[in-house]
């Protein structure tokens, strides 16, 4: 007997249940994932005043959505992962594109820290990148999580495309 894949809005993934868990019921995504990135941005922005934060920045590693929740204290982490897998593929792909850009920007900052003999030389530059480049990417990722995505940005294809767009903006 084959089990049906979980569907947003039904059963364990009912809108009420997702809302109670702080998971967007329309997208199946949770903003808690962004805490991982907000943490490193905070450290990057503190570098000019607290150069000792450089070690913590270098210790930061990218985590995908599922790995973040598996290692988090989020009370409904299993539900968050289940909802993520039920989220529209094109929406997840759009989120992952933003996450990849965030990870690349943080990696560049980490490389700059590793390759400078004195962190104070690059601390302000790195803090500016965090504020002016990484934070806007996190805001864009938040928009995806909340379903605030231009339909043309996710480039849906096939006969289910309109249904996915309609569900996203319902």
Place the predicted regions along the sequence by residue:
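Short acidic DE-rich linear segments
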Residues: 3, 155-170
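Short, low-complexity N-terminal regulatory "tails/caps" that precede and couple sensory modules
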Residues: 1-9
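Signal-transmission coiled-coils
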Residues: 9-162
């Amino acid at each position: 007997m084959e089990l049906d894949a979980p569907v947003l809005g039904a059963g364990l993934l009912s809108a009420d249940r997702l809302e109670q868990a702080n998971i967007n019921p329309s997208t199946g995504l949770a903003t808690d994932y962004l805490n991982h990135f907000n943490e490193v941005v905070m450290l990057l922005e503190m570098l000019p005043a607290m150069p000792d934060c450089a070690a913590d920045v270098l210790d930061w590693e990218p985590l995908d959505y599922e790995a973040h929740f598996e290692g988090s204290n989020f009370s409904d982490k299993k539900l968050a992962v289940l909802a993520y897998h039920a989220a529209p593929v094109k929406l997840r792909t759009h989120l992952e594109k933003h996450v990849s850009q965030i990870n690349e920007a943080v990696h560049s900052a980490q490389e700059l820290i590793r390759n400078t003999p004195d962190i104070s030389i690059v601390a302000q530059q790195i803090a500016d990148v965090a504020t002016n480049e990484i934070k806007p990417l996190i805001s864009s990722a938040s928009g995806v999580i909340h379903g605030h995505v231009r339909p043309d940005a996710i480039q849906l294809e096939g006969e289910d495309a309109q249904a996915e767009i309609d569900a996203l903006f319902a």
